[in-house]
Amino acid sequence: MKHPGSEKPQRTIAVTGGAGHFGGMVMRRLVEEPTVAKVISLDVRPPGWSHPKLEGVVGDVRDPELARLLEGVDTVVHLAFLISRYKPRSLYESINVEGSKNVFRAAVAAGASQIVYSSSVAVYGLVRDHPVPITEDTPRVHQPDFSYNDAKFRVEAFLDEFEAEHPELIVTRFRMVAALSPGVESMMGRSLTRGVIPSTSDVPWPIIWGEDVADALVLGVRQRARGAFNLSTEEPMSARDLAAAAGMRSLRFPRWLGVLAARLSSIADKLGLGNALDPAWIKYSDAVLVLSSDKARRELGWQPRCNTALEVLQRFRAESSETS
């Protein structure tokens, strides 16, 4: 009879994009898993911390010899993604789309039995006629003029075919709304730390706590869960209502001005002052993106620390002030 915690560590988990902020959150959880013997951080730079179970491997998701680096890996958690659309389009495409395909093919070639992919609410498309709430069965919508959606949509479309070709492979997908976490440079984060919530419409503001996303991914690894899982908070609120409840200021501006500001943010991006915001996020900001996370709660036992958007915002501001 096995006793809790008596499992022998035997799993090796590789995390692409492991040196990033979110990758670090996921790996710090994985090294504490009793069944995990080793966690491999696969990134173009080494992780900024150490642990007896952690191995840093400097590599590129586009490497044609990637399967060699993944030998002996049981599960691949694919987080690597170039967010800024202002990098050369060829680079954006090669890392986010072709790089993802290469990771999945290399994982199978190396003998991995599970792939965990960090997708996004964006795969459903930023459109106005979504059902409320959006479930995992809601059709995905391709928006080629929205680079983030274009990449995430095409990767998931590839995964559909790849999964059908490899029925023995466990494919786990997480589609989350915008995750807030202190220490991540962004236009939105800087605005929130100043006590301002910007918006162009009164649609619900979809946000989630970054730590809760990391928890969900680790649950997917631990349980070897198959399928897609939405991740969001409950009790959605508009930016105006959220600001009032949090004691913050709501800054409402016309959409055209937001698009212009997003385009100008490319200057900050090029200067290394944070990621630029794709103007498409503003262009389609009247989209209603209310996700149901019932499946993740029911099948994974996911219990987020922050259940509502208001709790996410309050925690973000509290922890941001502590680290500033």
Task: Give short role names for the model-derived ranges.
Residues 11-32:
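N-terminal Rossmann NAD(P)H-binding glycine-rich loop of SDR-like oxidoreductase domains
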Residues 48, 54, 58-98, 106, ...:
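NAD(P)H-binding glycine-rich loop region in Rossmannoid oxidoreductase-like domains
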Residues 98, 102-147:
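Conserved Rossmann-fold NAD(P)-dependent oxidoreductase catalytic core, especially the SDR/UDP-sugar
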Residues 216-277, 293, 314-316, 322-324:
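Mid/C-terminal beta-alpha module of Rossmann-like enzyme folds, strongest
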